[in-house]
């Protein structure tokens, strides 16, 4: 006769207490990825675990309006609103990409009241790696 396996509480039950509202985060990293089509803002703690994120698409902008500076500003404000409530005071900012929303997102981050320790441009630059796609003829 097979023994009954004792039920161990599921992982989901253990995670509920440490969910978004419970953690206090004094310092974090704000990643801004600005492409020509969209801007994605991700807020992580210093270990790299995602705390909050937002993009121009999730902020209600669709189509070509996602690439605008105003959409990037709105996305940054939405991502930061939750972490300010969790007690974040200082942050590092990493900006990646050539998009129009770079400066607008940084302006929204500065306006949020979080003290910025540094702002770094982490756009990947090839040392003449892969051949780029052919130029568009419109």
From Swiss-Prot:
Region (Disordered), start-end ranges: 1-22
Cell location: Plastid, Chloroplast
Predominant subcellular localization, coarse grouping: plastid
InterPro entries the record matches: Ribosomal_uS11, Ribosomal_uS11_bac-type, Ribosomal_uS11_CS, Ribosomal_uS11_sf
Chloroplast recorded as keyword: yes
Matching Pfam families: Ribosomal_S11
GO biological process: translation
GO molecular function annotation: rRNA binding; structural constituent of ribosome
A GO cellular component annotation in the UniProt record: ribonucleoprotein complex
UniProt feature, compositional bias: Basic residues: 9-22
Keywords attached to this entry: Chloroplast, Plastid, Ribonucleoprotein, Ribosomal protein, RNA-binding, rRNA-binding
Subunit details: Part of the 30S ribosomal subunit.
Protein family: Belongs to the universal ribosomal protein uS11 family.
Protein name from the UniProt record: Small ribosomal subunit protein uS11c
Organism per entry: Solanum lycopersicum (Tomato)
Lineage per the UniProt record: Eukaryota, Viridiplantae, Streptophyta, Embryophyta, Tracheophyta
The gene coding this protein: rps11
